[in-house]
C-alpha cells in the first residue's frame, strides 16, 4: 500500500502530526520502537492510580487554541503544580516566593525579602559570572543558592556548579507574593484518566506498529538510492539519503517521513554523538499507605540524596485510594542505548546539531521534529503547536 507519510514516533509530536494529516484525508502510518503509545507522557494505571512512567507531566499553556485542541481528546482536572523542595529536614515552597523566603529567613513582607536578597548579592560582589555557581549567586544570593539550587543542579547535570557554564541559568524567577503556583500560564491541569488516552485518540483510525525501530521497519528508497544500496532490500547500514519513496520491509511505500527520533542516530552518528542527560526511575507500590508525602512532587535539593525528586502519582488526580505509588527519579549519564531525556545545549552540542541540520536539509522527503529530532527541550503545549505547524506547512506544500 502507498502512504503519504510514515511517522516515526508515537509520542505527542508524532501523534498530533498524524492526527492533523489523517483529518485532512492523508494516508499515514505510525511506528514506534517502544511497546506503547504516547512516548514520554505515557501513563499506566496501577491500583486505580495513573502512574506517569517517565516522570511528572503537568500540562500548562496560555495558548487557547492548544488548550481547546487537547480538550478534544481528554477531560482535564484543575490540578495546580505546587512542588515542594526538601533540604535536610526543612521544606520550602517552589517556585521561590514569599512562602519560601518567610520559611528561610522568618520575614513576612516583600520589602524584607528583596532587601535580604539584595544584601547577599551585594556582599558577593560578582559582576561577571564565570560559571553557573557565580551566575546563580548573583541572581538569588547565597542562602537560596546553597539550599535550593546547588545540590539539585549538580545532581541534574552530574557536575559541580563551578564546572558548568553560566548561560545554563539565564534567570531564576523570584516571586514576591504568597503564590505557590509554579506556572503562570492561563490553563493548567492533568487529563482525568491519564495521558495515554490522548495519544490513543489522536491516532484513532491510523495504523500503528509498536516495538519496531525505523531501521528494522524500512527497506530503503527507490530512486537515486539504488546505486548506494538504498532501494528495496537495502542493507541495514544504508537507510539515510537519496530521494523518492521509502519502502517498508512489508512492501508498503511512503512518500514522506516524519522522524521524531534522535537526529544524530538517524545519520548513524556520522558527525559524532549529541549529548543528553538520562533518568532512572525507581517505582514502589505502598500497600496500606494512603498518603506518603502529601504532595505530588517533592524535590530533594541536597547533593547527598541520590535522587532529585519523589513523585506521588495519586495527588495528580486527587486520589483517595488506600494505597499509593511513588517514583524516585535519579539523574544519570547518557550513553547509546539509554533513554535520552534532556539535550545538553552547550556550545559544543549546539554546533554539532547545526551540522546535522545541514545533513537533514539534504534529506529531500524526510522531516525532523520533536524534542529528539530538533535537539530541543519542549513543554507539551509547544510540542503540539510545533507538530500542528509542521502539518499545516505540509498541507500548504501539497496544495
Regions found by a protein language model. Name each.
Residues 5-30:
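N-terminal Rossmann-like FAD-binding beta1-loop-alpha1 element of flavoenzymes
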Residues 11-13, 35-36, 99, 154, ...:
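Short, solvent-exposed loop/turn segments at secondary-structure junctions
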Residues 22-44:
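Glycine-rich FAD pyrophosphate-binding loop
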Residues 88-92, 99-221, 245-254:
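Active-site/ligand-binding neighborhood in enzyme catalytic cores
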Residues 219-250:
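Intrinsically disordered, low-complexity terminal tails and inter-domain linkers enriched
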